[in-house]
């Protein structure tokens, strides 16, 4: 293109002038500097600890030269491979995944992005660019292709100005969005990833960002394009083709199931790479930080083979038996000790675990965590809606707890416990349960979930009834469930009572027999 020709000639001229102005001694000194052997450093890193390899029963992952690396299963968030996943490292152009995600969320694909002089000339000379001139404009869709396929830095800057108003304000948006995704090891200072000491991330954080990015099919399609033809318009007069340097995307390395990815490189970060692939319904995200070319691609292939070959993704509701998740409503809240105003709970159907193929689901460690404040808020809101005659929950499903699964101490997935929001039976029971009462305040209602019970100002008899109600209760589908610890306690108490009764009756029988014997002796003496 003409603009490239002009810039090329200008670059040569500037380089010649700079060279002619530099003292010879400086150049001589630079040539004598000892060069860093990055490949030797990468080779040494292959002996570093791989944290996931220390998990008991976990498949042993490969030794790679990357400083930081992670393999994450997208649906469950399970980390299958971990090497320094929380270490602060420089991301380079994989930063653009976050910029692209924000653009997709904040802008319309048809919006126009006009490029200012600041956007065009703020980037480093010689860095990735498509040669946009100040005043020209692209659609957001074209900009995203330029961002992800050609890694165009001036396009990243233009998108940042479009969203944030200026390059200085946009990093606040980046850091806020990263935090919302659960990132705790990152700090972003620019939209493109050009080097800044305060611009860093971790393998784990980049996996979280990529996980969200590749959850959007349109974004995944853009990031999986080997080429893109940029059409001319009245705002951008040139036609040209963009080429993707990601070898698993452009076909240089063939690999089944690639969904997209992003390359990155600056001198201080070395090679960085993010890639997403899916096979048999299992989506894996691989992040490589600080590696040497072409091993960032070789590492990725090796980790994908490791993940797809050794792990399986399981839907929790297909395997969980301990919490009777196959039956909806395995938990409930009661308006009173008689069970009136029962409110159904269920377990989310979109929860997954990802575990080694050699480990059975039944062997996993599970832990139920409740949000007590949220549960009580749900009860109060629901009862108030029921008493007002509403039969539909205003806010739909509400998460009031979570079941966490792990292999030892290593998390492998979770699922939410939901309040279903079905008030059809609540309204009827509420009317019956509050008839004749002076107050309908929900604050005094007992709350039951799991093995935790709450009640206020109840009589001893009421307490006994409430205890029995807690042991035997039914789900929304009518299935009966037992609280095993409480049932065992009840059996012990019942056994003790039975023993006492037997002893008492035995003693009474002994006394009666003794009286009979005395009467017989007296009667016999009289007869004699």
Name what the model sees in each region.
Residues 1-12:
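Bacterial N-terminal signal peptides that target proteins for export
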Residues 27-204, 208-222, 279:
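Active-site-adjacent loops and short helices of periplasmic peptidoglycan-processing enzymes
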Residues 486-500:
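Substrate-recognition/cap regions that form aromatic- and gly/pro-loop-enriched pockets
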Residues 511-528:
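Cytoplasmic C-terminal tails of single-pass
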């Amino acid at each position: 293109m003409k603009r490239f020709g002009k810039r090329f000639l200008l670059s040569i001229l500037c380089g010649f002038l700079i060279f002619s102005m530099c003292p010879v001694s400086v150049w001589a000194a630079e040539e004598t500097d000892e060069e860093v052997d990055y490949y030797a450093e990468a080779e040494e890193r292959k002996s570093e600890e791989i944290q996931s390899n220390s998990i008991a029963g976990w498949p042993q992952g490969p030794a790679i030269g990357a400083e930081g690396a992670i393999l994450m299963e997208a649906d469950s968030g399970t980390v299958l491979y971990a090497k320094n996943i929380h270490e602060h490292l420089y991301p380079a152009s994989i930063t653009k995944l976050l910029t692209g995600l924000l653009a997709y969320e904040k802008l319309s694909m048809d919006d126009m992005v006009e490029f200012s002089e600041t956007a065009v000339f703020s980037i480093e000379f010689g860095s990735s660019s498509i040669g946009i001139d100040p005043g020209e404009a692209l659609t957001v869709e074209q900009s995203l292709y330029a961002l992800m396929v050609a890694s165009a830095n001036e396009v990243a800057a233009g998108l940042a100005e479009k969203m944030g108003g200026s390059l200085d304000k946009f990093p606040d948006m980046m850091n806020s969005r990263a935090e919302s995704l659960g990132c705790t090891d990152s700090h972003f200072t620019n939209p493109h990833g050009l080097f800044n000491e305060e611009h860093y991330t971790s393998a784990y954080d980049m996996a979280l960002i990529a996980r969200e990015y590749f959850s959007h099919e349109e974004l995944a399609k853009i990031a999986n394009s080997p080429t893109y033809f940029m059409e001319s318009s009245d705002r951008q007069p040139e036609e040209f083709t963009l080429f993707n340097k990601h070898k698993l995307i452009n076909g240089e390395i063939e690999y089944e199931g690639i969904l997209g990815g992003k390359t990155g490189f600056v001198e201080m970060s070395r090679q960085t790479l993010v890639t997403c692939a899916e096979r048999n319904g299992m989506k894996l995200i691989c992040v490589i930080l600080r590696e040497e070319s072409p091993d960032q691609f070789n590492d990725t292939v090796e980790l994908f083979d490791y993940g797809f070959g050794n792990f399986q993704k399981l839907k929790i509701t297909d395997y969980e038996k301990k919490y009777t998740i196959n039956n909806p409503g395995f938990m409930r809240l009661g308006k009173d000790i008689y069970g009136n105003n029962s409110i159904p709970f269920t377990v989310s159907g979109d929860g997954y675990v990802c575990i080694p193929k050699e480990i059975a689901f039944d062997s996993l460690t599970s832990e139920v965590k409740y949000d007590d404040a949220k549960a009580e808020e749900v009860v109060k809101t629901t009862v108030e809606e029921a008493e007002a005659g509403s039969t539909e929950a205003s806010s739909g499903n509400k998460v009031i707890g979570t079941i966490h699964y792990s292999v030892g101490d290593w998390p492998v997935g979770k699922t939410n416990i939901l309040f279903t929001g079905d008030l059809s039976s609540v309204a009827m029971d509420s009317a019956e349960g509050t008839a004749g009462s002076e107050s309908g305040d929900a604050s005094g209602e007992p709350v039951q979930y799991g093995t935790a019970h709450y009640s206020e100002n109840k009589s001893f008899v009421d307490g006994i009834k409430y205890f029995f109600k807690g042991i035997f209760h039914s789900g929304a589908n009518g299935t009966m469930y037992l609280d095993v610890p409480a049932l065992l306690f009840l059996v012990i108490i019942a056994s003790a009572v039975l023993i006492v009764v037997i002893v008492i009756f035995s003693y009474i029988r002994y006394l009666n027999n003794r009286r009979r014997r005395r009467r017989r002796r007296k009667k016999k003496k009289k007869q004699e």
